[in-house]
Design a protein with these regions (language model features):
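Alpha-helical transmembrane segments in inner-membrane proteins
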Residues: 1-256
């Protein structure tokens, strides 16, 4: 049944991408939008497309849509993995402190004035902050070679609260313009996303998603319980650590 759903979802995604590219301050008909996509893919060269429309769709809107798709896919897969690991439909990557760590990294880059110098500084600082936050949570939650689920959740809440407090402190010290810049980033604004951002995150996110999907069978086994998992030769603790690391990297790249 799932193999029938996947093609339908892919078709819907393509349709949504075309519609999203057609919507904006400058109206571009859906047919022209589809023609521009086909033209830039090198399938067929439509001569009726104006250069201004081509620039609007290909250079401005398409990078934003692709970034949105990549980030959405990364967070969706990460969330599904977290829900499978914790056997809780409310679980999400945020319990690892990744979002708070990324926020602290971003506001640090803004406060130091680095975000305005290069588009790479804020994503870099946000990714480093997210991974450091996840690492601290792992260290606090580790008990020997095991990572108890309850301890992991409590450690994530504690680290998120602490990093959130530091972020608020920095926000109170920087300029109003820098605060607005951080707030725009924190709500997931895509208006300034360009092909450079796509090139920066596309390959890492796709690789991480493929690796996470490859753990689908192990996740299904973990849902049965630790004893059942061990009986079929699966090491629950090792598998959880690998999954948590991949989720942290995937989420860090997405939120940055």
């Amino acid at each position: 049944k799932k193999y029938k759903v996947i093609p339908v979802m892919i078709i819907l995604l393509i349709a949504i991408i075309i519609i999203a590219k057609a919507v904006g301050a400058v109206y571009v008909p859906l047919l022209d939008t589809a023609k521009i996509i086909i033209k830039n893919l090198g399938i067929y060269n439509f001569t009726s497309i104006s250069e201004s429309q081509n620039s609007i769709i290909f250079l401005v809107r398409l990078p934003r849509v692709i970034v949105a798709v990549l980030v959405g896919a990364a967070l969706a897969v990460s969330g599904a993995v977290m829900q499978g690991m914790f056997r809780n439909p409310m679980a999400d990557p945020g319990i690892l402190g990744v979002s708070s760590g990324a926020g602290l990294g971003a506001v640090t880059a803004i406060g130091l004035g680095l975000a305005s110098r290069s588009i790479y500084f804020m994503p870099l600082f946000a990714t480093i902050g997210a991974l450091l936050a996840a690492w601290i949570v792992f260290i606090l939650a580790s008990s020997g070679k095991k990572i108890p689920v309850l301890t992991l959740i409590l450690s994530g809440i504690a680290v998120s609260t602490f990093l959130g407090a530091i972020t608020s402190l920095i926000l109170s010290k920087i300029s109003e313009y820098q605060v607005k810049e951080y707030l725009f980033w924190s709500v997931g604004g895509l208006s300034s996303r360009r092909w450079e951002h796509v090139n920066m995150v596309a390959i890492p996110i796709i690789i991480c998603i493929i690796l996470l999907i490859s753990f689908a069978r192990d996740l299904n086994v973990l849902l049965l319980g630790e004893e059942e998992a061990q009986s079929v030769g699966l090491n629950p603790s090792k598998t959880r650590k690998q999954l948590l690391f991949l989720v942290s990297v995937t989420t860090a790249m997405a939120v940055s």
